[in-house]
A protein has these predicted regions:
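Bacterial N-terminal signal peptides that target proteins for export
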Residues: 2-11
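Bacterial N-terminal signal peptides
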Residues: 10-20
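Transmembrane beta-barrel domains of Gram-negative outer membranes and organellar outer membranes
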Residues: 28-310
Length: 310
């Protein structure tokens, strides 16, 4: 499994490197004045086309930086973490994160955000076995007004649900339910805001205590009822040619163990096209400023997001 993830990352990195295309060069022959006029016309048309394409890509990049934008997207997020446990083990996670908007009426949208983790974990203990499998699904629904507030804020609120489908090593083994909220503002190329949720376990098995966790970790420790809080502040800058530079934290507080997990991710993304398909490629570095005992030290992220604008 680890080999497959590494191979996938290599291929996606190659796509990221070559997908921006090569510049084209006009050939010259025949009458100088005629060709100069034609070239000027073509240059003007190409420049106009390039400007329009760049503007369209930047607009899509701006939408993508909004977690509750009314746009279908399909992110495939590869995460690599290292330094886990006594063996300094590696962990690979592919998060499949489809986003679907639904129009409720003239004023409101419902945004569905799903996270399905596929995990490969080297044994963090000496003599242990490596484990691969899926984790629990985290399903969020945001009821969001179509129009921003008078001050330009975009917001959404709704329920978050943890669905226990994961392999035994990666599941909380119980349904989880709680509130989720997001608020953000977009102006002058900047996007900034925060996403928050909290999940309580609602049907823990008899051999587990209640889980109290906001956005439960995909590799939960102990058999407890979920009780966890997740906080994701973010800031991004989108350039006119659709580059995005962002900084985000994905902080979790486990109320059972009284422990914080505080990774901060610095990333850069480029929105481009493969044929007519708009795709965003992102690479990032993650550092854990705080983690439970045996938690990871640092990690990497690579995301390919396919966009389906209306």
């Amino acid at each position: 499994m680890i080999t497959r993830y590494k191979t996938g990352l290599i291929w996606l990195t190659l796509i990221f490197a070559v997908s921006f295309g090569m510049p084209s060069f006009a050939e010259t022959s025949g009458d100088q004045d005629t060709e100069t006029s034609e070239q000027d016309s073509e240059t003007s048309e190409n420049a106009s086309s390039d400007d329009s394409a760049a503007g369209g890509a930047a607009a899509l990049a701006k939408k993508l930086s909004n977690p509750i934008a009314s746009m279908i997207s399909a992110p495939f997020q590869f995460n690599y973490d290292t330094g886990l446990g006594e063996t300094d083990a590696d962990r690979w996670i592919l998060n499949i994160q489809p986003v679907f908007p639904f129009e409720l009426n003239e004023d409101w949208n419902l945004i569905s955000r799903t996270i399905l983790p596929v995990i490969d974990l080297e044994s963090p203990t000496v003599g242990g076995n490596d484990v691969s499998g899926v984790g629990d699904i985290v399903q969020s629904f945001f009821f969001s007004p179509k129009a921003p507030t008078k001050n330009g804020w975009i917001w959404g609120v709704g329920p978050v649900i943890s669905i226990p489908i994961g392999k035994d090593e990666f599941t909380a083994d119980q349904w989880g339910l709680g509130p989720t909220f997001v608020a953000l503002k977009q102006q002058s190329g900047w996007t900034y805001g925060a996403l928050l949720n909290h999940v309580w376990g609602i049907n823990p098995p008899s051999d587990r205590e209640s889980t109290n966790s906001t956005f439960p970790d995909v590799t939960p420790t102990g058999r407890q009822r979920t009780d966890s809080t997740f906080l994701q502040p973010f800031i991004a800058y989108i350039t006119p040619n659709a580059w995005t530079f962002n900084l985000v934290s994905e902080t979790t507080y486990d109320w059972n163990t009284k422990q914080w997990t505080v990774p901060v991710i610095a990333a850069v993304a480029k929105l481009t096209h493969i044929g007519k398909q708009p795709v965003s490629f992102q690479v990032g570095y993650r550092y854990y400023f705080n983690a439970p005992p045996g938690g990871p030290d640092w990690g990497l992220r690579f995301t390919a997001t396919f966009l389906f604008p209306k």
